[in-house]
Amino acid sequence: MAELLMDGIEKKYDGGSFAIKNFDLQIKDKEFVVFVGPSGCGKSTVLRMIAGLEKATAGSIYIDGKVLDKKMAANGDIAMVFQNYALYPHMSVYDNIAYSMKIKKVPKRQIKENVEKVADMLGLKEVLKRKPGQLSGGQKQRVAIGKALIRTPKVFLMDEPLSNLDAKLRTQMRMEIKELYKHSDATFVYVTHDQTEAMTLGTKIVVLNNGKIQQASTPKELYNKPANLFVAQFIGTPQMNVWKAKVVQEKKNVMLFIGGLGRYRLSEKNAELLRKRGYFDKEVYVGIRPEDIFLQVKGMDDEMFQSSLAARLKVYELDGAVSYLHLETAGESDSIENEKISSNENVAKNWNDTIESENKFNSNVTIRIEGNGDFREGEEYHFGFDESKIHFFDIETEKAIR
């Protein structure tokens, strides 16, 4: 059993800057938790504090209810795999893996059995006599994992272990780490800046930014229900489309006026959500993932077409079975939607001007579609949203509106 609890953790450096602040997190026994975030967000600092390599300025870390101390790491309860492998270059693969057991003066026979078992698990039996300089990057990483694995730790820490590998090897090693986790009784804590690694490996993902937890959830929850604007845009490739918009009542309909793109009629459910939360006649951020946008053809549904958005295709990318359409604002003078706004013409025009001058997000659009089609760069396309997948965020707090 290895349950971790981080209670009020802070890490403050001599200059007065905080690497970690107000950090509270529970990691359950046998979970695979991934810390992910941009460079400098504090994820590796948290891992090093769990490993005992750095001391928290405030707060405590507990493992199975006991305050973390140096003895836990020394006894082998915690093992860490580093980004740069941390192998002894003058030792063979066998001796690198066996090193911790030799230090403890474990009988040679038991060492041999354990090393061979780990080597077999990691596909290293054929290279046990080689030295690190004779190994590929993937083999070096397996040896580093073997060094940690042979200690049978309660907590397995990994600090960006795949960042030095090429794309093919990273994919292969992800699968191997996942298999290792399935057959292990340890709790895994993994650090990466790569969201693909995070989404494919973790049972729980902790998104960090500026030393604070933005959201800690399952991969599915994180993707479908981001807690704030940062998480929404950090998770997902290509990233979520986000625009500033104004919520306006137009006769019986509730419209979004999106600067540069036009107006969009909301479903009753989304309109009611914004009404209840008090966002009528206010600004919001609107987010939609590229795969949740669909193209509209005139005549399919004329009423829906009238309230669709429009932009010109700037770049068309075909990526095997998937296509990406990158569209940009058509420009106010020749935008179809701006010509059709009637009862709120002045509101829309003023809103377009305001958005274009101060919007921290541009009005460009990325759409992901299955397959390919006859798309022409420079032409204008109409599109709508899967309304069950629209996300709204508060302008001031950037928190999700739910």
Task: Enumerate the language-model features and the residues they cover.
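Conserved ABC transporter NBD signature motif
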Residues: G59-V67
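Conserved coupling/switch loops of ABC nucleotide-binding domains, chiefly the family-specific signature
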Residues: T57-S60, Q110, N210, I390
